[in-house]
């Protein structure tokens, strides 16, 4: 079984994933941000690095979904492959940070990948106010997250609300 935890930056996905994995004996699958070679550059120059960052995340998340499909364990994952396209890529496209060409290339890759894998069996959505997100982001103290704007977090929250409503 594949359980996805979805939600904005700083909403508590990793914390909930750890708690549920420990309590139920599930296998946690965490989004790898520590080894992402684009993340720091992305927050310094979003328009320049959006395609690279999102394509890197797409490849990582696709690998995660392939690994999850091979497992007999109950896997709980913080951040799903679906959030990349429906939240982050859609937001960057709307903000003018991704060209039409890059967007179409990304979407082609996403559709190909999704034709080979399935959605999570269950999705848990964590909703949080922007002031709470800002507080949590500041608490964890990742240097590259210091430049995240309130507008960006608001946009993501709106996209999450719309996506979850249609899910």
Feature-to-residue mapping (PLM):
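Post-Walker A alpha-helix
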Residues: 16-17
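P-loop (Walker A) phosphate-binding loop of NTP-binding proteins
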Residues: 8
């Amino acid at each position: 079984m594949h359980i996805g935890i979805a939600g904005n930056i700083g909403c508590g996905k990793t914390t909930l994933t750890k708690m549920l994995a420990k309590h139920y004996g599930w296998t946690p699958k965490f989004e790898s941000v520590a080894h992402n070679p684009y993340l720091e550059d992305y927050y310094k120059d979003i328009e320049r690095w959006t395609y690279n960052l999102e394509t890197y995340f797409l490849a990582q998340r696709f690998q995660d979904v392939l690994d999850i499909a091979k497992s007999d364990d109950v896997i709980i994952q913080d951040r799903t492959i679906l959030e990349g396209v429906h939240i982050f890529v859609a937001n960057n496209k709307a903000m003018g940070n991704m060209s039409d060409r890059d967007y179409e290339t990304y979407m082609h890759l996403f559709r190909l990948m999704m034709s080979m894998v399935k959605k999570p069996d269950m999705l848990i959505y964590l909703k949080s106010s922007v002031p709470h997100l800002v507080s949590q982001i500041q608490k964890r103290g990742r240097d590259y997250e210091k430049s995240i704007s309130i507008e960006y977090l608001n946009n993501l929250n709106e996209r999450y609300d719309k996506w979850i409503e249609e899910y």
